[in-house]
Amino acid sequence: MDRSRLGRHGRRVGLGVLGLLLLIQLVPYGWSHPNPPVTQDAPWPDAESARIARDSCYACHSNETDWPAYSYVAPMSWAVRYDVEAGRAKLNFSTWDQDDGEADDAAETVREGSMPLDRYTVIHRGARLSDAEADRLVAALEALDRADGGGDDGDDGRDGGEDGDD
């Protein structure tokens, strides 16, 4: 192919991609950005733990999501909406009165370094956790779990129910 044909072909591909990007804006998923009411915020053990959670977790794990501008433009809007819906379904700090005891799982996920998601912290650098912040958040999540009746219940790992009268 000569240079002029390549140029025309490249322009056509570029216009096709641009047209597709404009067309996908018509797909309604991701347009709506609901923030349901907060029924009960998590009772964080201290203000610093609450700040760390708000900075690193609340965008996806609360009903207080601050929807960024890119969350209104497809295909990013689809990914953002999906992440928030999935995050709220797994653990929602804004509906603590309806908590299903997921704080211990969240502590483990933070301890492993799986949360916050890398794709989130690339864009939101303030959500990155230092080692000290991660340790503090894990301790706070474990405290929330214990306060909700989870966590260490005195079980030493042996099967219960034995009374020694056998």
Language-model segments: which ranges?
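Short, Lys/Arg-rich N-terminal segment immediately upstream of the first membrane anchor
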Residues: 1-9
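Hydrophobic membrane-insertion alpha-helices, especially the h-region
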Residues: 11-28
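Electrostatic cytochrome c docking/interface patches
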Residues: 33-53
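The canonical Cys-X-X-Cys-His
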Residues: 53-64, 115, 137
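Short cysteine/histidine-rich zinc-coordinating motifs and their immediately flanking basic loops
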Residues: 69-75
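Extracytoplasmic electron-transfer domains, predominantly the class I c-type cytochrome c fold
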Residues: 78-124
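C-terminal capping alpha-helices of c-type cytochrome domains
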Residues: 113-114, 121-151
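Long, acidic low-complexity intrinsically disordered regions
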Residues: 151-166
